[in-house]
Amino acid sequence: MPLLNTLATPYADALLQVGESRKQSDALADEAKALLSAWSSSQDLQDAMRSPVLSVEGKKKALDSLFSESISPAMLNLLKLLADRQRIGMLDAVLERFLELYRELRGITLAYVTSATALSEQQQDKLTEKVKTVAGTTAVDIDLSVDPDLIGGFVVRLGSQVIDASLRGQVRQLGLSLARA
């Protein structure tokens, strides 16, 4: 287990335990996804929280003013605890680990889907059903991303299994077939 994961696990596990005891795990998972997205998309926020110039109290006040209206007290307490312990810089690792533990607990399979263009809601629903069938599960969490280099189609990653239904993948396979002939 990498060091960052080792450091993140106790915080993630504690958040999951709090969520389970209060029957808020599902809501906390949704908050974690939204917070992870906000954290990932704001380099300024990351820089400010990692800055040694900003005091711990300053970081906690900033977190409070930024998130107190949009997240639960349990999640806000986690943010403040990470700030207190000088670990706010690893927020993304803690949230990702929390989501892993949550999915494990709920039996949810994570699928990474990369498509050539953004998928409509209807396409996402169809894809979700197909992924459930392939994964042999009733619950799936899909992490969508867009890569125009795929030319067309999509690539699905389920653990170590990769399903390449992209035009780029088909062209590559054709090239390999021709090279062997």
From Swiss-Prot:
Bilayer topology: Peripheral membrane protein
Cellular component per GO? Answer: plasma membrane-derived thylakoid membrane; proton-transporting ATP synthase complex
Which terms are listed as keywords in the entry? ATP synthesis, CF(1), Hydrogen ion transport, Ion transport, Membrane, Thylakoid, Transport
Q: Does the keyword Transcription regulation apply?
A: no
The keyword Transcription is assigned to this record? no
Location of the protein in the cell: Cellular thylakoid membrane
Any one GO molecular-function label of the UniProt entry: proton-transporting ATP synthase activity, rotational mechanism
Per the UniProt record, one Pfam family is OSCP
| Subunit structure and binding partners | F-type ATPases have 2 components, F(1) - the catalytic core - and F(0) - the membrane proton channel. F(1) has five subunits: alpha(3), beta(3), gamma(1), delta(1), epsilon(1). CF(0) has four main subunits: a(1), b(1), b'(1) and c(10-14). The alpha and beta chains form an alternating ring which encloses part of the gamma chain. F(1) is attached to F(0) by a central stalk formed by the gamma and epsilon chains, while a peripheral stalk is formed by the delta, b and b' chains.
Per the entry, what this protein does is: F(1)F(0) ATP synthase produces ATP from ADP in the presence of a proton or sodium gradient. F-type ATPases consist of two structural domains, F(1) containing the extramembraneous catalytic core and F(0) containing the membrane proton channel, linked together by a central stalk and a peripheral stalk. During catalysis, ATP synthesis in the catalytic domain of F(1) is coupled via a rotary mechanism of the central stalk subunits to proton translocation. This protein is part of the stalk that links CF(0) to CF(1). It either transmits conformational changes from CF(0) to CF(1) or is implicated in proton conduction.
* Membership in a protein family: Belongs to the ATPase delta chain family.
Protein name (record): ATP synthase subunit delta
